[in-house]
Amino acid sequence: MRSFIFALLTLCSLMAVADEQWKPFPYDQSGFDYSGDKLRQAWPQLTRGFGDNYPFPDAQWVMKMATTHPKALEMTVAGNTGFTGKPEDAEAYAQKLQNVWRLVFKGDFAQAKKEGLALGVGGQVPAMFAQVVYAMFLVPNQEEKHRLLEEVIDYTDKAGELVQADTVAQFGRVYAKARLGEELSVPVVLKRGYTSQIPNELDALLAKQPGQPFALALYGGYEAGVIRKVGKMVGKMTYGVSADKMETYFAQSFKQADNLPIGHYEYANALTYVYGDDEEAKAVQHLKQAVALKPINAMEALEVAHAKALLKEHEQKVAQN
């Protein structure tokens, strides 16, 4: 019975993907070719935001995950993914999984989601990561953006404890909540429990991986976002956030990796949320740092483009004052 349910869930997921029409990546993709061995060679740099030693999804990793997480294996087999748990199937499955990551890094987000979900639990991580990136940068309206982010959270809810097996899955889940928390009203955020879930999930992730740059920057952005909504005093007394903690999280993130565009523009936003115009020069400095970085994948190209737009807004603001 459980196998039937798992297979049904997988089928429903694939049907949902088929109905979606996502916008294509708007920039040149020629610099994001990670075919063949290029993916493994570039993997440490491509995944530096996830922290040190995020595992490359080769056949050895596939078998390790299958052995360590029997429920994931059961779901994968039930989903008719072509992987039966036998070592002789692992290489073919790993190649398919690697290709999903290639699609993510190249900016073929819709195809990455489709092919990722077709691989079952193992492919959900890059599939949902592709969806988060697409939702944040390419969705034309806020309602659709929120729907896609909520779907990411729903996928991780269905995965249950399996989310704990992958730090990117954990990050994607809390990132989606944090982005929704920024844009939804305070009553809605409170009703959904995001004000406690976001810091709790970030604490759990950082306890497991203290040096993850993305998670550290997200925590800093969360602190700033709460201050922006409720003010410094209420933020500190009610939610335990502060400008000092915001600064500490970003400093730790930059110490781990200072060449991530998103880190610099998120810090620029945080400075504005917390200090207003008082740290305008510093915000502009970090936006310029983001813009100066050469993107090595599609997500970073979107981040640099976003930083350019923010920088233009700040420069126009300065010119008017």
Residue ranges and their predicted role:
Residues 1-4:
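Positively charged n-region of N-terminal signal peptides that target proteins for export
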Residues 6-11:
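Hydrophobic helical h-region of N-terminal Sec-dependent signal peptides
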Residues 13-15:
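N-terminal signal peptide c-region/cleavage motif recognized by signal peptidases
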Residues 18-163, 168-170, 176-182, 195-203, ...:
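N-terminal alpha-helical interaction modules that lie
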Residues 120, 199, 238-243, 247-248, ...:
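TPR/TPR-like (Sel1-like) alpha-helical repeat modules
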Residues 135-148, 181-194, 227-241, 274-282, ...:
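Short coil/turn connectors between adjacent alpha-helices in alpha-solenoid helical repeat scaffolds
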Residues 173, 187-262:
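Extended amphipathic alpha-helical interaction segments
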Residues 258-260, 269-275, 279, 286-289, ...:
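Outer membrane beta-barrel transmembrane domains
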